[in-house]
Amino acid sequence: MIVYVLVGLSAFCIVLYLISQGQSDCVVLITGESVRVQGCRIDGEFGSVLSKLKPFGCGSFRS
């Protein structure tokens, strides 16, 4: 019984480690005033989507 628990815990730790290594630091921050892209590799399709993004501007008094 203890062997199964140790094997399961070991497998969980290995999978968690592998998942955390595959993450990138790509951040798309959309606020009311701007759209910021940080740390992203921009290819053709992602670039076309980014060009269409606009700030929310819900609370803006601008006309």
UniProtKB/Swiss-Prot annotation:
Localization per Swiss-Prot or TrEMBL: Host endoplasmic reticulum membrane
Assigned GO CC terms: host cell endoplasmic reticulum membrane; membrane
Biological-process GO terms, alphabetical: transport of virus in host, cell to cell
Sorted UniProt keywords: Host endoplasmic reticulum, Host membrane, Membrane, Transmembrane, Transmembrane helix, Transport, Viral movement protein
Membrane-side (Cytoplasmic) residue stretches: 22-63
Record InterPro entries: TGBp3
Pfam families noted in UniProt: TGBp3
Transmembrane intervals: 1-21
Miscellaneous: TGBp1, TGBp2 and TGBp3 seem to act together for cell-to-cell propagation. TGBp1 is the main movement protein that physically cross the plasmodesma with the viral genome. TGBp2 and TGBp3 would facilitate TGBp1 function.
Family: Belongs to the Tymovirales TGBp3 protein family.
The protein's role, per its UniProt record: Plays a role in viral cell-to-cell propagation, by facilitating genome transport to neighboring plant cells through plasmosdesmata. May induce the formation of granular vesicles derived from the Endoplasmic reticulum, which align on actin filaments.
Protein name: Movement protein TGBp3
Species per Swiss-Prot/TrEMBL record: Potato virus M (strain Russian)
High-level lineage: Viruses, Riboviria, Orthornavirae, Kitrinoviricota, Alsuviricetes
